[in-house]
Amino acid sequence: FDFFLLKIGDLTIKLNNLNCKCLNFVKIKNKWSEIIGLYKCCENNCSISKPICNCTKGNGFGNLINDENIKYILGKEGFDKIVEVHAKNSFKKPQNSSNYSLFYFEIKCEFEGGVNCEKIWMNIGLRNLNVNKYIYYSATESSIYNGKEESFKLSTLSFNNNDIFGCGLVYPPSNKINYKFPYIFFTQNGKQIGKGLKSSKNSNSYKPYVWLKCCSVEANFGNNLETKPFIYKISEHLILEEFY
């Protein structure tokens, strides 16, 4: 009987080994690159001023301090505007990859105007460059949006000053015929939130981005994980089985 159980145990181990899904983190040198024109403070484009100054129209806006930091400057007399900022380099589908491929970045949020400011807004996500759709997590609404005008509310989550949010993209191996689509997932303070989102067929290139209002962020694109590791342990990421 003990010998029989031992054989069953050996078989289970072998099956688990066969089902093992190897995953590689794809390191891409990245930085914040551009503020989308529609979301600039005014026609004078004060958001690119160096050194930082207030908007001549009194509007609030986002300013690219350096490669990783976006500082939101509160308005004086005008409106605090939403700012949309994209990273320079996209997450592109790997070619001839025998493993699952993981792309990932994180941002640390700093509230401007006080922790109780009702104007604070932050979205983190990826823009599908093939079909111009946005897949993102809204920390303000505690909701995940799938790019198809559908959202999924995560009612138990809160949004606090100094929270760290992450967005990941996983591509299957090139020869994985039955797993056609990549998926996207989100994290908060080192833990996955919600389920994954399967993407569309036309999904070869994604660009990291954020929407901000009254909220500054510091990004970690994984440029140097030895000195600045992610809060989320990417080495322990398991291929998701549950999706919206």
Region locations from a protein language model:
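PRY/SPRY (B30.2) beta-sandwich protein-interaction domains
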Residues: 1-244
